[in-house]
């Protein structure tokens, strides 16, 4: 199954807020609940919705998500917590959380077009796993800095998680440590994803 490129608001109406997918929000006061069945939710449906939230928020394919669940299952700590840490330490997600891109798909495009450096080296793989003390910068040309400049200026520094720091003048971000569960940008029950 490939990456989702269809209408994003349909997914937000179905699954709830997905800040990594889009900044748009559905119209308030519309009859969204009447369109979908509002009866008793089955356990399978609940687990599937949690899995789909995770997939669409981080922009993963089914195969990528299964690979991350498999890696997290081998860890000695809680599988759900390790899964979220793996997903949050992806380069495209860190760019989004730093405020260098408006959405995760936008951050993926910055990485794919070779505008981003990690520790002074060009990285063009959005799923690159960042480690503590990694320094994330833009290329030293005007075009790369211009792409990131508008997003950094409009981002809210109060929403920056504790495991990241950003220098807005030099367009430089730093990964301080591995993320805690309480700073994940998505409201999700990761245990249901692992059970699915």
UniProtKB/Swiss-Prot annotation:
Residues 17-36 are annotated as: Disordered. Keywords: Chloroplast, Plastid, Ribonucleoprotein, Ribosomal protein, RNA-binding, rRNA-binding. The keyword Plastid applies. SMART domains: Ribosomal_S4, S4. The keyword Ribosomal protein applies. GO terms for biological process: ribosomal small subunit biogenesis; translation. It is found in: Plastid, Chloroplast. InterPro entries: Ribosomal_uS4, Ribosomal_uS4_bac-type, Ribosomal_uS4_CS, Ribosomal_uS4_N, S4_RNA-bd, S4_RNA-bd_sf. Residues 89-157 form the S4 RNA-binding domain. GO terms for cellular component: chloroplast; small ribosomal subunit. GO terms for molecular function: rRNA binding; structural constituent of ribosome. PANTHER family: 30S 40S RIBOSOMAL PROTEIN, SMALL RIBOSOMAL SUBUNIT PROTEIN US4M. One of the primary rRNA binding proteins, it binds directly to 16S rRNA where it nucleates assembly of the body of the 30S subunit. With S5 and S12 plays an important role in translational accuracy. Belongs to the universal ribosomal protein uS4 family. Part of the 30S ribosomal subunit. Contacts protein S5. The interaction surface between S4 and S5 is involved in control of translational fidelity. This is Small ribosomal subunit protein uS4c. It comes from Calamagrostis epigeios.
């Amino acid at each position: 199954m490939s990456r989702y490129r269809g209408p994003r608001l349909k997914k937000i109406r179905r699954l709830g807020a997905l800040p990594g997918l889009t900044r748009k929000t559905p119209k308030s006061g519309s009859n969204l609940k009447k369109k979908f069945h509002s009866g008793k939710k089955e356990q399978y449906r609940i687990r599937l919705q949690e899995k789909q939230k995770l997939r669409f928020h981080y922009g993963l394919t089914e195969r990528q998500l299964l690979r991350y669940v498999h890696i997290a299952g081998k860890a000695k700590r809680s599988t759900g917590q390790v899964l979220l840490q793996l997903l949050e330490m992806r380069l495209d997600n860190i760019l989004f959380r730093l405020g260098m891109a408006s959405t995760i798909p936008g951050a993926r495009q910055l990485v794919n077009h070779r505008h981003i450096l990690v520790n002074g080296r060009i990285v063009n793989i959005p799923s690159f796993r960042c480690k503590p003390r990694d320094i994330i910068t833009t290329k030293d040309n005007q075009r790369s800095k211009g792409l990131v400049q508008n997003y950094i200026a409009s981002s809210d520094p109060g929403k920056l998680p504790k495991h990241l720091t950003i220098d807005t003048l030099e367009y430089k971000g730093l990964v301080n440590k591995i993320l805690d569960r309480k700073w994940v940008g998505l409201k999700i029950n990761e245990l249901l994803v692992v059970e699915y």
